[in-house]
């Protein structure tokens, strides 16, 4: 019964990606980007808005705000079951 630690960042981004939930991403310079998360890795997030994709480096991101609340408990349990 060895539980792996929950990676909250990956769980959150994966959930908004799977649900096609619109997000607003606030950058450290105050600029905001709106769109859908299409993918992410350790260093970047790819978002799409009006048919255009942008790759944003995570170190430039201040906040990611989804349109609706995310159920992180259910998402992390589903993620653990996939492992």
Swiss-Prot record:
Keywords of the record: RNA-binding, Stress response
InterPro entries: Hfq (IPR005001), LSM_dom_sf (IPR010920), Sm (IPR047575)
Highest taxon of the lineage: Bacteria
Domain Sm: start-end pairs: 10-70
GO BP field: regulation of DNA-templated transcription; regulation of RNA stability; regulation of translation, ncRNA-mediated
GO MF, one annotated term: RNA binding
Record's GO cellular component terms: cytosol
UniProt keyword annotation of RNA-binding present: yes
Protein's job: RNA chaperone that binds small regulatory RNA (sRNAs) and mRNAs to facilitate mRNA translational regulation in response to envelope stress, environmental stress and changes in metabolite concentrations. Also binds with high specificity to tRNAs.
Subunit structure: Homohexamer.
Matches recorded under PANTHER family: RNA-BINDING PROTEIN HFQ
HAMAP family: Hfq
NCBIfam families: Hfq, PRK00395.1
Family: Belongs to the Hfq family.
Protein name: RNA-binding protein Hfq
Species annotation: Desulfitobacterium hafniense (strain Y51)
Phylogenetic lineage: Bacteria, Bacillati, Bacillota, Clostridia, Eubacteriales
Recorded name of the encoding gene: hfq
